[in-house]
Amino acid sequence: MANNEDSNSNGLDSFDAVKQRFKDRSKKVVQTRELLSKQAVQTREILSKQAVKIAKQAEEHERFINKVTHLVGVLGFGGFCFLLGARPQDIPLVYCFFYVIFVPLRWIYYRFKKWHYYLLDFCYYANTIFLVDLLLYPKNEKLFMVCFSFAEGPLAWAIIVWRCSLVFSSPDKIVSVLIHLLPGLVFFTIRWWNPATFAAMHPVGTDRRVSWPYVEDKAYLFTWLFLVPLVVYTLWQVLYFLIVNVLRRQRLLRDPEVMTSYRELSKKAEKANNKLWQLSGLLGDQNRIWMYILFQAIFTVATMALTVPIFLSYRLHVIFQILKISAAVWNGGSFLLEVMPRQVIQKEKKKKAEMQPIEEQILHHEAVSHPTENEPKSTET
């Protein structure tokens, strides 16, 4: 009997020991969990504070970069204007330098942003032809006139119609303006201000232009300033359609983030529900791209036709240069005074919405970590 009691007491002792061991382990688990929870809270708090700090530093760096870009842009444009008056014969070289440096950089940037199909647009196609003319065939009269038609036709009027903005704090906008503006200035200087061209057009002791560029024949002018450029433009349109809408169609359908000129124009027109969107839908949504091609063809034909009187009149050509530059500056002012403030307000709202949960979390953790005097503190029992 005594043995049974001893065995029972031993069993109870061992059971109590096991139970105590489980309690100790549970207590350790709870303590470990509390410790890890505190560490997680502290880590979260540190990361939240760092996120706020990084956001403020990024904003300061962005402002500094914008100021530097604005400074460089203003000085660069001022230097170009000085060079335009002091040494107009060097403007073609400046343009070639600009194209060789900035267009490849733009391709890299646009590739990263999935905008690289923009580089298949007509303005880049035409600028490539300009580069070939200036570097390889600078005395080819016919190619010069084709380039003149492109530069002072579709490219020049795009500044006005598509509202290209001269914003010195935006490298992308500066490059966009210069791609459309510089070619016209280049061929303006060659046409009227280049001393070598002056000598060719007005030989000493004669009133006739006996050499390049020979422009007396109106049929000759019409052919090389309108008909031939129109054929070259049509070739580009066919190639563009084959590449973007046939060969790369599936790629574009798989990735809606990849942008093309048609996608951008259609999105903006649909959002604004403007005349362009309404007219492009006359033949149905499935035929909108054909309507855009038609509109672009009409725009190109009209602007190329205007290059003939511009080519013949120095005064008209000067007025047109002033009009282009004024339009780019006006659009830039509109962007700075109207569009940019709205963008800043939207950006601030978005940033506040993103940072508000983080700030609330920080305040909550501080309140939990540092209770006020009126709040009861936990006591061990």
From Swiss-Prot:
Top-rank taxon: Eukaryota
GO BP terms, alphabetized: phospholipid biosynthetic process
Location of the protein in the cell: Membrane
Lumenal face of the membrane: 85-89, 138-141, 195-223, 313-315
Recorded catalytic activity of this chain's protein: sn-glycerol 3-phosphocholine + an acyl-CoA = a 1-acyl-sn-glycero-3-phosphocholine + CoA; sn-glycero-3-phosphoethanolamine + an acyl-CoA = a monoacyl-sn-glycero-3-phosphoethanolamine + CoA; sn-glycerol 3-phosphocholine + (9Z)-octadecenoyl-CoA = (9Z-octadecenoyl)-sn-glycero-3-phosphocholine + CoA
GO molecular function: glycero-3-phosphocholine acyltransferase activity
Its membrane topology: Multi-pass membrane protein
Pfam families for the chain: DUF2838
Cytoplasmic compartment segments: 1-63, 111-116, 163-173, 245-291, 337-381
Record's keyword annotation contains Magnesium: no
Keywords assigned: Acyltransferase, Lipid biosynthesis, Lipid metabolism, Membrane, Phospholipid biosynthesis, Phospholipid metabolism, Transferase, Transmembrane, Transmembrane helix
Entry GO CC: membrane; plastid
Transmembrane segments: 64-84, 90-110, 117-137, 142-162, 174-194, 224-244, 292-312, 316-336
E.C. designation(s): 2.3.1.-
PANTHER family: GLYCEROPHOSPHOCHOLINE ACYLTRANSFERASE 1, OS01G0585100 PROTEIN
Function statement: Glycerophosphocholine acyltransferase (GPCAT) that utilizes acyl-CoA to acylate glycero-3-phosphocholine (GPC), forming lysophosphatidylcholine (LPC). Shows broad acyl specificities with a preference for 16:0-CoA, polyunsaturated acyl-CoA, and the hydroxylated ricinoleoyl-CoA. Also catalyzes the acylation of glycero-3-phosphoethanolamine (GPE) with acyl-CoA. In addition to acyl-CoA, GPCAT efficiently utilizes LPC and lysophosphatidylethanolamine (LPE) as acyl donors in the acylation of GPC.
Family: Belongs to the GPC1 family.
Protein name: Glycerophosphocholine acyltransferase 1
Gene field: GPC1
